[in-house]
Each structure stands twice: as structure tokens, then as C-alpha cells.
From Swiss-Prot:
The gene is nuoH1. GO terms for biological process: aerobic respiration. This is NADH-quinone oxidoreductase subunit H 1. It comes from Koribacter versatilis (strain Ellin345). Its EC number is 7.1.1.-. Keywords: Cell inner membrane, Cell membrane, Membrane, NAD, Quinone, Translocase, Transmembrane, Transmembrane helix, Ubiquinone. NDH-1 is composed of 14 different subunits. Subunits NuoA, H, J, K, L, M, N constitute the membrane sector of the complex. GO terms for molecular function: NADH dehydrogenase activity; oxidoreductase activity, acting on NAD(P)H, quinone or similar compound as acceptor; quinone binding. Belongs to the complex I subunit 1 family. NDH-1 shuttles electrons from NADH, via FMN and iron-sulfur (Fe-S) centers, to quinones in the respiratory chain. The immediate electron acceptor for the enzyme in this species is believed to be ubiquinone. Couples the redox reaction to proton translocation (for every two electrons transferred, four hydrogen ions are translocated across the cytoplasmic membrane), and thus conserves the redox energy in a proton gradient. This subunit may bind ubiquinone. It comes from the Bacteria.
């Protein structure tokens, strides 16, 4: 078993390429666990960031600075009564939240967190991702229909109309990326890992390719992905001021928590897709401009140094904390947290760990920026009316995405012609 584990660590590929169902299963379980913990952390950060935007403190009661509030919320949801309304289609009512959660998690099968940190390198990864992510709206419509409530049904129908409006523009933006992958090889790729490798080979993230064409395509996808996940300011399917709670009005307890978990997991998933397609995926900043062993080492030890800085901050806070009985528990918790961060930083300095974790760190840092943008949007922009949302999708994003696709094709042909002429001249 140990030799099998060591052989897998030496293998520079995905578990699917290694041909081991065991390691593929382990990866799936790890992704499920990490994504669930990330959702808990995301809910805490969202409440804190929104509180600071509104000059409040946010959760402060449960744990130091409210750090244990997500755990308290999860336990509360698990022990709440689970009510099924009279007249509801019980089978569909039960299946809808499970389907929402499963479609969100299934997307992670093709998302590469690093060259060897993906469940599988599927050669139709982009097509698989688009198809699976589109299934979530069917579960939302299922929830609205099966609840036997006019508010829930309206929310489900809104979600379906919203998905149709924004999925087209999102798909065209993705097609422009697929066209960019074929510039040097002559044949594009639908592999998510292949798209990141194409950005590395061309020496540029696709957000900067054919500037500003790549940037416009990225902005279209960024807007569409907010609408795709039903987040503010495009949260019309669950508009509290109009539809009580939209498609999950009649849900409570554990089943409501599955909708909640699916929404946040989908947010992380679409952010990961945007990072993979336009921001170089797991590639560190400036991989071509700042190349060489020295720069590779400097960027690979950065995660460990960051954990050491965070640990130092915890110890400084521990020293400065008032020596009163009321602060004793917080002081102990802060000190233990600082020790854990320091231990993680020390482990990240081990060469074998440092090389593998560096990819995950840079990927996660980019995704974290998108998570902050989600919170920023919610605290800043008012909710659109439904007719305004439809108008943006059909009259703005769709024509612009078509224009971006045409311009990308023209510039790509021009690039290939110039490259061909230069090759003939040589």
C-alpha cells in the first residue's frame, strides 16, 4: 500500500491517467470535504465583509470573533423540523435539493487545481462542464413545480428564463477561448488542462489575448456566471421582496441547507472555470516573463511564508489580548490557531509538498478574488427588475458576445497568416 502511494506521488498526472479507481475516489472525497469546508468559510466571510460594508461587526458571539458561527448554523439546520407541504409532489420535492447539490459537485470532476490535481483530464471537459452546470436549473424548476406554491413556481420559471438568456452569451464567450487555444497548434482543445497549457505555451493569459477582445469575453462570462448562480444583483428566482423566498419558499431544515450548499459550491465551481479559461488556472503570476529556477523557488515558497506571517499575526494578537478571564478562551484559541498555521507553513517548506501545493495555492488565490467579488456585488448593487435582466441578456450580452467571437476569429486568422509568412521567410 505504501509503495502504491509513493508511486502515485511520483506520477505527474491525474488519477484518471494513472488508471487507479482508488485514487480517483480519494480525490472525489477530498474535493467534497474541502468544498464543504470552503462553503462554511465563505458564509462566515460574507457575513463579516457585508457587516463591515454597513459599519457593523457581524457575528461575534460563537467563538472568537464569531469563527464558529458557520458550525452553529449547520447544526441548527440539521436539527430543524423538515416540513413537506400538503399537495406537494413528494418525490420531486425530495429530489430537487439533492439534484442541485449533485450537479454543483459533479462539475469539479473536470476542474484542474493543478497539472496533477484533477480527478480526470477529460478530452471534452468544457462540453461536460457546460452540460452539467446547465442541469442545475432543471432542479430549480423541479423544486418550484413540486412545492405546490405560486411563489415557488414563479421562482422556478424565472430561473429557467434567466438561464436561457445568459447561457447563450456565456457559451459564445467560452467558444472564443477555444478558438484561442488553436493559435499555435492549429487544433483547439476541449480539455481544461489543455486550455491552461495553451496559455502557458502562448506566454499570455487569455484575458489579455487580442486585447481587449479577451477581456470583453471574460467580463461577459463574469456577468453571466453571477446570473447562472442566482446571486445578487441577479437573484430574481429567490427575490425576498417579491416571492418570499422563491423556489425554496416551502423548504426548511436539511433540504433547505442542500440548496444553500449547492449555491455556494456552484459559485466556487464557476469561479474555478473562469480562472481556468482566462486567468491561467494553476499557473503562478508571470510564468514566462519571470522564468528560471530562482523565480520558481521564490513563488513556490510564498505560500509557506504567508502562513508564517498569519501565524505571527495570531501570536501578536495573543500577546496584546487583555489578561482578563473573559478573554481567556479567545486567547487560548488564538494561540492554538497560530501554532497550527505555523505547522502548516513548516510542512509547506518540504520540497515534495512545496511543488505540489504551489499550484493549488495560486489557483485558490485567484478563486478567492472571485468569491470576494460575489460578496462585493451583493453589498453594492440593487436587484434588477426581471424585464431589465432579460434586456441585458438578450440586447447587450448576446450581441457583444457575437461580436467578440467574430473579432477573435478574424484576429486569429490574421495571427496564423502572419506566423505562416514569417515561417516561409525563414
Amino acid at each position: 500500500m505504501i509503495s502504491h502511494f509513493l508511486n502515485f506521488l511520483k506520477f505527474n498526472g491525474t488519477p484518471g491517467e494513472y488508471g487507479s479507481p482508488l485514487w480517483a475516489t480519494v480525490y472525489i472525497l477530498v474535493i467534497f470535504g474541502v468544498a464543504s469546508v470552503a462553503v462554511m468559510l465563505m458564509t462566515y466571510l460574507e457575513r463579516k465583509v457585508l457587516a463591515h460594508m454597513q459599519i457593523r461587526l457581524g457575528p461575534m458571539r460563537v467563538g472568537p470573533h464569531g469563527l464558529l458561527q458557520p458550525i452553529a448554523d449547520a447544526l441548527k439546520l440539521l436539527i430543524k423540523e423538515d416540513i413537506v407541504p400538503d399537495g406537494a409532489d413528494k418525490f420531486l420535492f425530495w429530489m430537487a435539493p439533492v439534484t442541485v447539490m449533485m450537479t454543483a459537485f459533479t462539475t469539479y470532476l473536470v476542474i484542474p487545481f493543478g497539472r496533477s490535481h484533477a480527478v480526470t483530464d477529460m478530452n471534452i471537459g468544457v462540453l461536460f462542464m457546460i452540460g452539467i452546470s446547465s442541469l442545475g436549473v432543471l432542479a430549480v424548476v423541479m423544486a418550484g413545480w413540486s412545492s405546490n406554491s405560486k411563489y415557488a413556481l414563479m421562482g422556478g420559471l424565472r430561473s429557467a428564463a434567466q438561464m436561457v438568456s445568459y447561457e447563450v452569451a456565456m457559451g459564445l464567450a467560452i467558444v472564443s477561448v477555444l478558438m484561442m487555444t488553436s493559435l499555435q497548434t492549429g487544433t483547439g482543445t476541449l480539455s481544461m488542462i489543455g486550455i491552461v497549457q495553451a496559455q502557458q505555451a502562448q506566454g499570455s493569459w487569455f484575458i489579455f489575448k487580442f486585447f481587449p477582445t479577451g477581456l470583453v469575453a471574460f467580463v461577459i462570462f463574469a456577468i453571466a456566471m453571477v446570473a447562472e448562480t442566482n446571486r445578487a444583483p441577479f437573484d430574481l428566482p429567490e427575490a425576498e421582496s417579491e416571492l418570499t423566498a422563491g423556489f425554496h419558499t416551502e423548504y426548511s431544515g436539511f433540504r433547505w441547507s442542500l440548496f444553500f450548499l449547492g449555491e455556494y459550491v456552484a459559485m466556487i465551481a464557476v469561479s474555478s472555470i473562469a480562472v481556468t479559461l482566462w486567468l491561467g488556472g494553476w499557473l503562478r503570476p508571470f510564468p514566462n516573463a519571470l522564468s528560471g529556477a530562482t523565480w520558481d523557488f521564490a513563488f513556490s515558497v510564498f505560500p509557506a511564508l504567508l502562513f508564517f506571517v498569519l501565524a505571527a499575526g495570531c501570536f501578536i494578537g495573543w500577546v496584546r489580548m487583555p489578561s482578563k478571564p473573559a478573554f481567556k478562551v479567545q486567547a487560548i484559541g488564538l494561540g492554538i490557531f497560530g501554532v497550527l498555521l505555523g505547522m502548516i507553513g513548516a510542512v509547506l517548506l518540504i520540497p515534495a509538498v512545496r511543488v505540489r501545493v504551489s499550484d493549488i495555492f495560486w489557483f485558490s488565490a485567484k478563486v478567492g478574488v472571485f468569491m470576494y467579488l460575489y460578496i462585493w456585488y451583493r453589498g453594492t448593487f440593487p436587484r434588477y427588475r426581471f424585464d431589465q435582466l432579460m434586456k441585458i441578456g438578450w440586447k447587450v450580452l448576446l450581441p457583444v458576445s457575437l461580436g467578440v467571437l467574430i473579432v477573435t476569429a478574424v484576429l486569429g486568422v490574421r495571427h496564423e497568416l502572419i506566423a505562416g509568412l514569417m515561417g516561409v521567410a525563414r
